[in-house]
Amino acid sequence: MAAAGSATRRVGFVGAGRMAGAIAQGLIRAGKVEAQRIVASAPTDRNLCHFQALGCQTTHSNQEVLQSCLLVIFATKPHILPAVVAEVAPVVTAEHILVSVAAGVSLSTLEELLPPNTRVLRVLPNLPCVVQEGAIVMARGRHVGSSETKLLQHLLEACGRCEEVPEAYVDIHTGLSGSGVAFVCAFSEALAEGAIKMGMPSSLAHRIAAQTLLGTAKMLLHEGQHPAQLRSDVCTPGGTTIYGLHALEQGGLRAATMSAVEAATCRARELSRK
């Protein structure tokens, strides 16, 4: 479907938590979908308040969302998603495109719960979607074509960078980018605390640390450089940076970070098998 067509499409959300709200807000801010053409459901009004403030329609009926919208994003907790999908299955049609953002629930599980040939995709966003700077991957089910994939990618680019991947990469993305937000925060905190130790005020140190991460990330993305090249560019013989990098290597930063991604990925795979 052409990009222009997505502006008039109705988008539904089953589940109205923080991630659902972030995606909806991104769609609205980017002009991808008009607020009044978004319908969200949740058991209580607590989470729906954010959608109502955005100008979206809300309901307590999950089936009503599917009866109103052909593109529906399931943003419930993973452990209740199978029950929710089974609940709405009677109103699913061949026209629906269903998207799950729940970690640990496979495409095959979703397809088994839905009518034959239902078009299903998995999307794994991360927390920076809240500020429209998310890292998002999506994997398509057996009955999804390139047009549906392009439509969803076009919409989700309102929330950050969106890449299509094989489903096998989804758990790795959880370890790299979902959990990676916490890893980066831990490094940012340590970076700032090093400056605090040397005498810089706390608030200033944390602002500069965050800005350093932001600026570095933009250089890596916009210039397409490998991190090793940028790291080398910053180093001068006998300078401050190479001394600092030596200290990081002595502390095992590189190995510890790789192990963190591995551990988080293995845990994601373990949860997927339950």
Swiss-Prot record:
Q: Name one GO molecular function term.
A: pyrroline-5-carboxylate reductase activity
GO annotation terms (biological process): L-proline biosynthetic process
Instruction: Locate the N-acetylalanine modifications and list their residues.
Output: 2
Q: Which GO terms describe its cellular component?
A: cytosol
- Keyword Amino-acid biosynthesis in record: yes
Q: Which PROSITE patterns match?
A: P5CR
Q: Which UniProt keywords apply?
A: Acetylation, Amino-acid biosynthesis, Cytoplasm, NADP, Oxidoreductase, Proline biosynthesis
Q: Known catalysed reaction(s)?
A: L-proline + NADP(+) = (S)-1-pyrroline-5-carboxylate + NADPH + 2 H(+); L-proline + NAD(+) = (S)-1-pyrroline-5-carboxylate + NADH + 2 H(+)
Q: What is the E.C. number?
A: 1.5.1.2
The superkingdom listed in its UniProt entry is: Eukaryota
Biological or metabolic pathway of the protein: Amino-acid biosynthesis; L-proline biosynthesis; L-proline from L-glutamate 5-semialdehyde: step 1/1
InterPro entries according to UniProt: 6-PGluconate_DH-like_C_sf (IPR008927), NAD(P)-bd_dom_sf (IPR036291), P5C_Rdtase_cat_N (IPR028939), P5CR-like_CS (IPR053790), P5CR_dimer (IPR029036), Pyrroline-COOH_reductase (IPR000304)
Q: Does the keyword RNA-binding apply?
A: no
The record, for Pfam families, names: F420_oxidored (PF03807), P5CR_dimer (PF14748)
Q: Where in the cell is it found?
A: Cytoplasm
What is the first-listed, main subcellular location in coarse terms?
cytoplasm
Name the job this protein performs: Oxidoreductase that catalyzes the last step in proline biosynthesis, which corresponds to the reduction of pyrroline-5-carboxylate (P5C) to L-proline using NAD(P)H. Proline is synthesized from either glutamate or ornithine; both are converted to P5C, and then to proline via pyrroline-5-carboxylate reductases (PYCRs). PYCR3 is exclusively linked to the biosynthesis of proline from ornithine.
Give the PANTHER family listed for this entry.
PYRROLINE-5-CARBOXYLATE REDUCTASE (PTHR11645), PYRROLINE-5-CARBOXYLATE REDUCTASE 3 (PTHR11645:SF0)
What family, per the record? Belongs to the pyrroline-5-carboxylate reductase family.
The subunit structure is: Homodecamer; composed of 5 homodimers.
Report what the protein is called: Pyrroline-5-carboxylate reductase 3
